[in-house]
Amino acid sequence: MSYKFPNNLKYADTHEYVKEENGLLKIGVSEFAIDQLGDIVFVELVEKGTNLQKGETFGTIESVKAVEEVYLPFAGEVLSVNESVIDNPEILQNDPIGNGWLLIIKPESNVLLDELMNSDEYKSKVSPN
């Protein structure tokens, strides 16, 4: 499978992506990680208004192969939860970078997106040598 690695995203070691939009952060899971999971059957996410610390679990993704936790790369308050991926996990599977985003957070403080991998670094990490 050929994966997309948009230049406007940053990636955590745990395969979450971050997209900055007007000072807020949209969080999701990379195409690579979603593909590795296989058919997704269930998504559970924290509630809107939840305050989370960096590295804290904000949900789980269950597939026919495994149950994986997803982690927040930066501390912040959850402003929005993508209810459509909870109601229809296929959205996450089919369009993880577009309509399959998971959360929008207001970061606790100024975040250093450069702490995360850029698209080229992430592509190198997940691509076979």
Curated annotation (Swiss-Prot):
The coenzyme or cofactor needed here is: (R)-lipoate
CDD domains annotated for this entry?
GCS_H
Q: Which GO terms describe its cellular component?
A: cytosol; glycine cleavage complex
Residues with PTM N6-lipoyllysine: 65
Any single GO BP term: glycine decarboxylation via glycine cleavage system
- Quaternary structure (record): The glycine cleavage system is composed of four proteins: P, T, L and H.
Which PANTHER family would you find in this protein's record?
GLYCINE CLEAVAGE SYSTEM H PROTEIN (PTHR11715), GLYCINE CLEAVAGE SYSTEM H PROTEIN-RELATED (PTHR11715:SF3)
Role description: The glycine cleavage system catalyzes the degradation of glycine. The H protein shuttles the methylamine group of glycine from the P protein to the T protein.
Family, per the entry? Belongs to the GcvH family.
Protein's recorded name:
Glycine cleavage system H protein
Instruction: Record the organism.
Output: Prochlorococcus marinus (strain MIT 9515)
What gene is it encoded by?
gcvH
